[in-house]
Amino acid sequence: MSAIQAAWPSGTECIAKYNFHGTAEQDLPFCKGDVLTIVAVTKDPNWYKAKNKVGREGIIPANYVQKREGVKAGTKLSLMPWFHGKITREQAERLLYPPETGLFLVRESTNYPGDYTLCVSCDGKVEHYRIMYHASKLSIDEEVYFENLMQLVEHYTSDADGLCTRLIKPKVMEGTVAAQDEFYRSGWALNMKELKLLQTIGKGEFGDVMLGDYRGNKVAVKCIKNDATAQAFLAEASVMTQLRHSNLVQLLGVIVEEKGGLYIVTEYMAKGSLVDYLRSRGRSVLGGDCLLKFSLDVCEAMEYLEGNNFVHRDLAARNVLVSEDNVAKVSDFGLTKEASSTQDTGKLPVKWTAPEALREKKFSTKSDVWSFGILLWEIYSFGRVPYPRIPLKDVVPRVEKGYKMDAPDGCPPAVYEVMKNCWHLDAAMRPSFLQLREQLEHIKTHELHL
């Protein structure tokens, strides 16, 4: 007998596994893939009261839906779970034991640095095929060429095409989880057939951001084609499955293509980045109420991240987006990590990053607070670049000696005080986002922002 499942609380998001047409008037019909929110448990534990995305409520059968979960923190997602990196020929043969025809893995070549080796178990022994890397393409036979390892594996999975056998079963590297399986299990996998890509709205070094249509709704889609880059973006997507707040850009789902493409689908923010929004409108259009509202929107998102132990690490007006109805939402979770983790900082935006984060790679909610102070300065200067007229190389030495930017023209003194509090050199002296929100609400209530 199966254990009785604990009832899902109100607010739980579910994804439909099948179509449900409904038989009674109180039923809520839905299609496979729809996202539904639980409103309440009914007397019968097999049925829930739920609402769909347009707010219509009704009764749904529990066994037709699955609960959406965050991808577990610490799960090592991989687009290539069969890729084992630098292992020797002998280690590969041990991993493919006991022999099973079609069991395979890919490793880095030990004899030919820069190339790879496909190791396949076949009729009791292991065959090793060199994958040559030439002119940015991969090939085993120098006849068929592939853009990346995923395309190569997909090809030989459907057809042996000269190998001893077609690839049947990947030998998954210990500790990794196939990304597609995990997004599917946790209810975040979307169907490529239902996504229409309409036009490019942004270009990044990783690929394009496109306006799309998913089941009749406008969406933004990050299209990542390169397998190494896609691997890095998996971390961003899995962080986004754990976060839900009205001032964070909402993940709608992920599509992992067998050929190696990764599509991250989010809500569409019609008015673009906050920095462009501010620059294109300026003082004549945007009054004090509007600037303070944007400041509070961002602060509430950051208070939520603070409360859930996430550090954003790249907070700036360019990474805040504005919706059709003028709500500011924090986006770009590429560097967001659980608070305890450290990482190599690579190319950090010097003018937005706290001194201790630049110096010792110490990231915390308090370094996010420093960046929030810079973002407030951007808002009240209508999108100017911080530290105007100071050469980039001089910014850090001056800041470490205690230099703080002047208030932007026309900035209310009370708001400038909040900025300066964010720029304490001693991180412990900076306010929390909870305190910052309270300070901004005090300014709003007492109309100190006008």
Swiss-Prot record:
Main localization (coarse): cytoplasm
Alphabetically ordered keywords of this record: Acetylation, Adaptive immunity, ATP-binding, Cell membrane, Cytoplasm, Immunity, Kinase, Magnesium, Manganese, Membrane, Metal-binding, Nucleotide-binding, Phosphoprotein, SH2 domain, SH3 domain, Transferase, Tyrosine-protein kinase
GO cellular component, one term: extracellular exosome
SUPFAM superfamilies (alphabetical): Protein kinase-like (PK-like), SH2 domain, SH3-domain
Residue span, Protein kinase domain: 195-449
Signal peptide interval: none
Interaction with PTPN22: region residues: 9-70
Phosphotyrosine, modified sites: 184, 304, 416
Listed EC numbers: 2.7.10.2
The protein's name: Tyrosine-protein kinase CSK
Organism (species): Homo sapiens (Human)
Key word Metal-binding present: yes
Cofactor(s) the protein needs: Mg(2+); Mn(2+)
Family annotation (InterPro entries): Csk-like_SH2, Kinase-like_dom_sf, Non-receptor_tyrosine_kinases, Prot_kinase_dom, Protein_kinase_ATP_BS, Ser-Thr/Tyr_kinase_cat_dom, SH2, SH2_dom_sf
Catalytic residue list: 314
Modified residues (Phosphoserine): 364
